[in-house]
UniProtKB/Swiss-Prot annotation:
Belongs to the universal ribosomal protein uL5 family. Pfam families: Ribosomal_L5, Ribosomal_L5_C. GO terms for molecular function: rRNA binding; structural constituent of ribosome; tRNA binding. This is one of the proteins that bind and probably mediate the attachment of the 5S RNA into the large ribosomal subunit, where it forms part of the central protuberance. In the 70S ribosome it contacts protein S13 of the 30S subunit (bridge B1b), connecting the 2 subunits; this bridge is implicated in subunit movement. May contact the P site tRNA; the 5S rRNA and some of its associated proteins might help stabilize positioning of ribosome-bound tRNAs. It comes from Methanococcus vannielii (strain ATCC 35089 / DSM 1224 / JCM 13029 / OCM 148 / SB). This is Large ribosomal subunit protein uL5. The gene is rpl5. One of its GO terms (cellular component) is ribosome.
Length: 181
């Protein structure tokens, strides 16, 4: 019995996207970071949070606690809409999604090398080109029991999202091709 049949029979077993995290590693503070913030805001529709350097690296001119990156967390419909556009950009850049990108509980990451690959984006010489890492986290209905404050409980192993389930979900929902090594 395929996962699709199980999901139709038991809807509580169908995985869903918990969150999509978009990481923008600019590597320096200043103008490039503020321009990157505008780019990520146009792509996601949300204001980004600045990430700080954890340690000093004089070779790159980075000091500890200096803002050098940006990140945005998307949930719900915003996450799904962004992911559809991200997969289009991923295909345009000529990359493939490998099964090794998925961990044992179905979460996966991929990178988009150029933000201009997204639909509706054009190259602007004053902005330049920015790449990003996209991390997708899965869950099933009922995962709230592990994070709620009262009567917290563990998720049983049979209710965790499996790697194969996440791959099938991504292929069916977004039409992405996952290559098995």
């Amino acid at each position: 019995m395929s996962f699709q049949e199980v999901w139709e029979k038991e809807p509580m077993k169908k995985p869903r996207i918990q969150k999509v995290t978009v990481n923008f590693g600019v590597g320096e503070a200043g103008d490039r970071l503020t321009i990157g913030a505008k780019v990520i805001e146009t792509l996601t529709g949300q204001a980004p949070v600045r990430t700080l350097a954890k340690q000093t690296n004089p070779a790159f001119g980075i000091r500890k606690k200096l803002p050098i990156g940006l990140k945005v967390t998307l949930r719900g419909k915003n996450a799904e809409e962004f992911l559809e556009n991200a997969f289009v950009a991923f295909k345009v850049s000529g990359k493939v999604l490998y099964a090794s990108s998925f961990d044992k509980v179905g979460n996966f990451s991929f990178g988009v090398p150029e933000h201009i690959d997204f639909p509706g984006q054009k190259y602007d010489p004053t902005v330049g080109i920015y790449g990003m890492d996209i991390c997708v986290t899965f869950e099933k209905p009922g995962y709230r029991v592990k994070s709620r404050k009262l009567k917290r409980s563990h998720i049983p192993a049979k209710h965790l999202v499996k790697k194969e389930e996440a791959i099938e979900y991504i292929e069916k929902k977004f039409g992405a091709e996952v290559v098995m090594e």
